Amino acid sequence: MVNLLQIVRDHWVHVLVPMGFVIGCYLDRKSDERLTAFRNKSMLFKRELQPSEEVTWK
């Protein structure tokens, strides 16, 4: 039990930093999904695109 507590005390950074990265990536993807729901609702982006024109919301 003492060894487990010592390991946690010594290496907590090695667990929290990757967890923060993974949680940040997950939240970023969810935010992007939420924002794409409003992609064509804005008056600025509602117009028809020219045949050679690319989408602006990549």
Curated annotation (Swiss-Prot):
MF terms in GO: NADH dehydrogenase (ubiquinone) activity
Any one cellular-component term (Gene Ontology): mitochondrial inner membrane
The keyword Signal is annotated on this UniProt entry: no
Recorded superkingdom: Eukaryota
Compartments (UniProt record): Mitochondrion inner membrane
Pfam family, one: NADH_oxidored
Membrane topology: Single-pass membrane protein
Stretches that traverse the bilayer: 11-27
Biological process, per Gene Ontology: aerobic respiration; mitochondrial electron transport, NADH to ubiquinone; proton motive force-driven mitochondrial ATP synthesis
Keywords: Electron transport, Membrane, Mitochondrion, Mitochondrion inner membrane, Respiratory chain, Transmembrane, Transmembrane helix, Transport
Functional summary from the UniProt entry: Accessory subunit of the mitochondrial membrane respiratory chain NADH dehydrogenase (Complex I) that is believed not to be involved in catalysis. Complex I functions in the transfer of electrons from NADH to the respiratory chain. The immediate electron acceptor for the enzyme is believed to be ubiquinone.
PANTHER family per record: NADH DEHYDROGENASE [UBIQUINONE] 1 BETA SUBCOMPLEX SUBUNIT 1 (PTHR15222:SF2)
Oligomer status and interactors: Complex I is composed of 45 different subunits.
Family, similarity comment: Belongs to the complex I NDUFB1 subunit family.
The protein, known as: NADH dehydrogenase [ubiquinone] 1 beta subcomplex subunit 1
Species for this entry: Homo sapiens (Human)
